[in-house]
Design a protein with these regions (language model features):
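C-terminal cap of metal-dependent C-N hydrolases
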Residues: 367-369, 373, 386-430
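Histidine-rich, glycine-flanked metal-binding segment
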Residues: 25-28, 37, 41-84
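Divalent metal-dependent hydrolysis catalytic cores, especially in the metallo-beta-lactamase
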Residues: 115-139, 156-163, 195-207, 225, ...
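Active-site core of metal-dependent hydrolases
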Residues: 202-316, 340-341, 372-375, 393-396
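Metal-associated gating/positioning segment near the N- to mid-region
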Residues: 81-152, 171, 210, 236-241
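Active-site gating/metal-coordination segments in enzymes
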Residues: 169-214, 248, 297-302
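Histidine/acidic-residue-rich catalytic or RNA/ligand-binding cores of hydrolases
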Residues: 98-101, 141, 211, 236-242, ...
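His/Asp/Glu-enriched, well-ordered alpha-helical/loop segment
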Residues: 313-398
């Protein structure tokens, strides 16, 4: 399906929403003074800095408080708040929603388009100034990529993939969408790029070696990077074939980790989707101790999402240990949530990195610099430096002391624009929409049947 169909639907959507979320563009000169800067390079905190933003670009980063020059500019005293590069969520599906996927699959294209945009814009308010889509039907992600780029509304940067490329009978490869053999794989990759994809997502678990090589070679010849939904032994095969990044990496082995470190392959573990009952309880106990459990609705729904994807203790332990090993080996890590809402689950993914043994600094780099490097835009994004675009997150507390201080976000800037931090009047939070769906009927039985794992931590009140 050509993405213009989704864009046509999006045109109606923008007309409905534009009155409340009009893109203004970076205007004039803004100075953020008395800022403590964590620049995303791995360098220590730069204390007492002043950041000058001219339009969309950082034009000054100097030590000391701002000294008035007589020129007209807006000066914002951050009073010691912490500034990082904008966060990236590198594994996003804009329209899917655990545990309701099966009941949302029948929704109209228009409903899916609207849900995708609301999800993306709420992610921006949580500090995620850029998203990488990793599999989306009807080119809905491309439609929103173009809508935000063209300024219809203020939203995050989207690096869209369109639909995943998978062989027939593979994961995400039904009869209508599957691509089999080298010729079909090449055509599938080219058609997605022709329709606006900036990323190619493949599912290589069931791919033959020549199909895998064809997918990577074709995308690279067109200047587009490739990421793979993969589990062992397909992880090793993909890395050996030159894949740019690995998603999930189920059953990741020491041999694959060593090869990834050697070849510079990026790893997006989506660890938040690989938790056992023990780890879910560990997470919620920790957040409660830090005072982040006051929002009963958020706690209830993020827990429901977690149990919708609960894994066995053995699986969860292996994935946690693999992430720690990858970090220690120097594999370049990426932050990706897989589940939504993008903002809350993205925060949980960053927190889960630290619970898995990754340092706070390396976690921030995985959410800022590394994504920009992978996507080839490190000259413009990913760090707080002069000459780069002003995608910034301002927090009242230091995330290097406790990663959960990312929850103290005070301001977000995208292209130098200060993002409104609350939904427009009269609109719902994403969690309000999620809550309105109610507990999904028969979800637990269906998911257990598919996974072969009996979920012990049933939050649905019986079977």
């Amino acid at each position: 399906m050509n993405h213009r169909n989704a864009l046509g639907t999006l045109g109606v959507t923008t007309a409905l929403l534009a009155s409340s979320l009009v893109w203004a563009g970076g205007q004039g000169i803004t100075v953020l003074t008395n800022a403590n800067v964590i620049d995303g390079t791995g360098a220590p905190v730069q204390e007492g800095m002043s950041i000058t933003i001219d339009g969309a670009v950082i034009t000054g980063l100097v030590a000391g408080a701002y000294a008035p020059t007589g020129e007209e500019r807006e000066v914002i005293d951050l009073a010691g708040a912490y500034v990082t590069p904008g966060f990236w969520n590198m594994h996003v599906h804009l329209t899917t929603l655990l545990p309701h996927n099966h009941q949302l699959n029948g929704a109209s294209l228009g409903a899916k388009v609207i849900r995708a945009g609301v999800n993306a814009m709420e992610g921006l308010r949580h500090g995620f100034t850029a998203l990488r889509s990793t599999g989306e039907e009807h080119y809905i992600d491309v439609a929103w990529q173009e809508a935000f780029d063209e300024g219809f509304m203020l939203g995050p940067r989207i690096f869209a993939s369109g639909e995943s490329v998978s062989p027939t009978a593979g994961h995400r490869g039904d009869v209508e969408r599957g691509a089999d053999g080298v010729a079909e794989i090449r055509k599938a990759v080219r058609s997605r790029i022709q329709n606006g994809a900036a990323v190619i997502k493949i599912v290589n678990v069931e791919m033959l070696p020549d199909e895998l090589e064809a997918a990577i070679e074709t995308a690279h010849s067109l200047g587009v990077h490739v990421t793979a939904h993969s589990r062992e032994p397909a992880v090793y095969a993909a890395v050996e074939a030159g894949i740019d990044s690995i998603e999930h990496g189920y059953g990741l082995t020491d041999e694959s980790i060593a090869l990834m470190a050697e070849k510079g392959t990026f790893y997006d573990p989506t660890i938040i989707c690989n938790l056992s009952d023990e780890y879910i309880r560990e997470r919620e106990t920790r957040l409660a101790s830090l005072g982040y459990s006051d929002d009963e609705q958020a706690v209830r729904l993020r827990t429901e999402i977690a149990y919708a994807d609960e894994r066995s203790p053995e699986h969860a332990r292996h994935q946690r240990e693999a992430l720690a090993k990858a970090a220690k080996a120097g594999v370049k890590l990426l932050v990706g949530s897989d589940s939504m809402p993008i903002g809350e689950i993205g925060w949980l993914e960053m927190e889960q990195f630290v619970l898995s043994g990754v340092s706070e600094m390396d976690t921030l780099i995985a959410a800022t610099r590394n994504p920009a490097e992978l996507l080839g835009v490190l000259d413009l994004l990913g760090t707080v430096e002069e000459g780069k675009l002003a995608d910034l997150v301002v927090m009242t507390a230091n995330p290097l002391e406790n990663i959960s201080n990312i929850r103290t976000i005070r301001m977000v800037f995208k292209d130098g624009i200060s993002v409104p931090m609350t939904p427009p009047p009269g609109t719902l939070r994403f969690y309000d929409y999620y809550d309105s769906l109610g507990p999904p009927s028969s979800f637990l039985e269906r998911s257990e049947s598919l996974s072969g794992f009996v979920r012990e931590g049933n939050p649905y009140g019986g079977r």
